């Protein structure tokens, strides 16, 4: 095990566990995405440090971002504060933004990502292949990882067109 991803679920009293795809849009519309995102970031960093305190090897913990969190302009200071408070080394934190979200506020995202990289945080583009970005567009973003969408990965062993596309991306 070399990495883990923090995933939030809404534990609804009557509907049970609700996946993020079913409530993140509402959280963004109502302004709750900021507090939810901060909670997830804090919990992920704390848990990664807790595992280290228990004697486990350090692992990278990944947290998904919403473009709304980036727009607020407080993300870099929040990440810096959480890293200091938790004691997690920045290299063990990875922040992810989906490819489709990169199309919004491009220059602001690039600037924020550059500042986060200066802190030592790892950055990733998630769900690559689901948006309409060209590779020349994506290379503008200072990221450490590009995570290919699982829809492409599923067809890898079957000789499908998805497999050909995925292999071409990996070869680059």
Indicate residue ranges for each PLM-predicted region.
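Catalytic strand-loop-helix junctions within cyclic-nucleotide turnover domains
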Residues: 11-15, 69-71, 156-157
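Catalytic-site-adjacent helices and loops of nucleotide signaling machinery
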Residues: 16-20, 29, 125-138, 162
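Flexible loop/coil segments at beta-strand boundaries within sensory signal-transduction domains
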Residues: 13-15, 54, 115
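Cyclic nucleotide signaling catalytic output domains
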Residues: 22, 26, 43, 62-67, ...
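Conserved long alpha-helical elements within nucleotide-processing catalytic cores of c-di-GMP signaling
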Residues: 18-25, 34, 110, 114, ...
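The catalytic core of metal-dependent phosphodiesterases that act on cyclic dinucleotides
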Residues: 3, 7, 80-156, 170-172
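Active-site core of bacterial EAL-family cyclic-dinucleotide phosphodiesterase domains
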Residues: 1-26, 64, 96, 125
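Catalytic core of bacterial c-di-GMP phosphodiesterases, primarily the EAL and HD-GYP domains
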Residues: 1-5, 30-108
